[in-house]
Amino acid sequence: AQMRKIGNRLYGCDTCQIVCPVNRGKDWTHHEELAPDPETVKPLLVPLLQMSNREFKERFGASAAAWRGKKPIQRNAVIALGHFREASAVPALIRVLMDDPRPVLRGTAAWALGRIGGAEAERALREALAGEPDPEAAERIRAALEALGSSESSESGFQEV
């Protein structure tokens, strides 16, 4: 359920500004200096997955995303790719699944691959499951494989993980 609620947001600060009662009715469009940088607030998602700590600090250091840190932003990028069912992201998600040292990111990549589907994703999930040392990440991989299996008989292809 958490994955569904995040949707395609990388961080929630923009949403808070939109719904804040203090900001209701304010028109910030005439203050160019307050306009968000599109590259910062809506970055390309796949490059975020390979971003180093230094690159993250350089790119997001002056934004509200910086206080969240790289890991949550990368996790949320993986979730967004899963929600978009972005097939072109499968190779990058497989790299996260196979190579990332963080079990949370490996498990989240498994979830995204389960949402996107395809033979390449399924092969990678099966291979990853055989060598996954973390029990929670392994459970996410199993759930993703189950979602892929149920997608053949389900119209939506979606099983909440």
Residue ranges of model-derived segments:
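Iron-sulfur cluster-binding cysteine motifs and their immediate structural context
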Residues: 9-11, 15-33, 92
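Amphipathic alpha-helical scaffolding segments comprising HEAT/armadillo-like alpha-solenoid repeats
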Residues: 55-60, 86-98, 118-130, 151-161
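Ferredoxin-like iron-sulfur electron-transfer modules
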Residues: 1-12, 66-68, 99
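Long C-terminal interaction/binding lobes of large macromolecular proteins
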Residues: 103, 108, 123, 127, ...
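Alpha-helix N-cap/helix-start positions at coil->helix boundaries
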Residues: 67, 71-72, 87, 101-104, ...
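Structural detector for internal amphipathic alpha-helices that build alpha-solenoid repeat scaffolds
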Residues: 74-86, 95, 106-118, 138-151
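Non-heme iron-sulfur electron-transfer modules
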Residues: 1-4, 23-53
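Glycine-rich phosphate/pyrophosphate-binding loop
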Residues: 38-75
